[in-house]
A protein has these predicted regions:
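Acidic/polar, glycine-rich intrinsically disordered N-terminal extensions of enzymes
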Residues: 1-41, 51-56, 69-73
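A structural-propensity feature for long, helix-poor, extended segments
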Residues: 54-99, 103, 177-218
Length: 249
């Protein structure tokens, strides 16, 4: 029934189907998730599900993984352009005094969106404001855009100097881009996990050497750094994409 998709897609012609496999259970001991979990994986890449399962089997033999989700932030970064540097610098000094007003403006747009911080940076005649929000259980992309619009509109009449022009998003937030901002702040939920893999387990079940694996990671990290890569992990993109697709994201 295409009418159910009104507002969600244009030029609708049908659906794409991707096969979904499952791997698990995997044992997780987290601050919020604690137990054994089955992981859905949408893919046509042969051996991906099997690789998950092989890893989970070894993880479970080591007692599972420890995990924590310690931040949940979504950013928007407006910028204001002024006639010259001294004017912009004056605004950069003034903006931190308006944080409570920014919070009130953001809160007026949503029951869930709350402004957590505002980080100011000055580049030439332009002031950038990195606004970070908590958005409850929502991804919050539209939510934080509306909140940022309200914040800017509340600030503009009070500014000691009127900007030549301004943008609701300057790309400083890192939205839809691989950037260091994800490490410096957060882009959604910030999660960490830890597992200790004894050398004897690695040797028995992976037929590998722990020291050789560590050396490989070190060398690959240096290689990735030469390309300017932001992520230094071992090819998690395929697995994450498969998980996101299976979960409807």
């Amino acid at each position: 029934d295409s009418t159910r998709l009104a507002g969600s897609i244009e030029g609708f012609i049908g659906y794409a189907q991707i096969p979904i496999g499952v791997a698990g259970p995997v044992r997780i001991k987290g601050r919020y998730a604690d137990g054994e979990f089955i992981i859905p994986i949408a893919t046509t890449e042969g051996t991906l599900v099997a690789s998950f399962q092989h890893a989970f089997n070894v993880m479970n033999r080591c007692g599972g993984a420890l995990a924590a989700c310690n931040r949940q932030l979504v950013g928007r970064a407006p910028c204001f352009v002024f006639t010259d540097l001294p004017t912009a610098a004056a605004i950069a000094d003034w903006l931190p005094t308006q944080f409570e007003k920014m919070q009130a403006a953001a809160a007026s747009t949503s029951r869930y969106c709350r402004l957590q911080s505002a980080k100011i940076s000055l580049v030439g005649n332009t002031v950038y404001v990195m606004l970070e929000y908590a958005t409850g259980d929502a991804a919050g992309q539209n939510m934080v855009t509306l909140a940022t619009q309200a914040v800017c509109e509340a600030l503009l009449p009070q500014m000691p100097h009127t900007p030549v022009h301004w943008l609701v998003e300057s790309a400083l937030s890192g939205d839809k881009r691989s950037s260091a901002q994800a490490f410096l702040g957060a882009r959604g939920r910030n999660a960490s996990a830890e597992i200790v893999l004894p050398s004897r387990i690695i040797g028995r079940y992976w037929r590998a050497d722990a020291a050789a694996m560590a050396n490989c990671w070190n060398q690959a990290t240096v290689g990735a750094a030469q390309t300017g890569a932001v992520g230094m992990q071992g090819n998690v993109a395929n697995a994450l994409a498969a998980l996101f697709i299976a979960c409807g994201q």
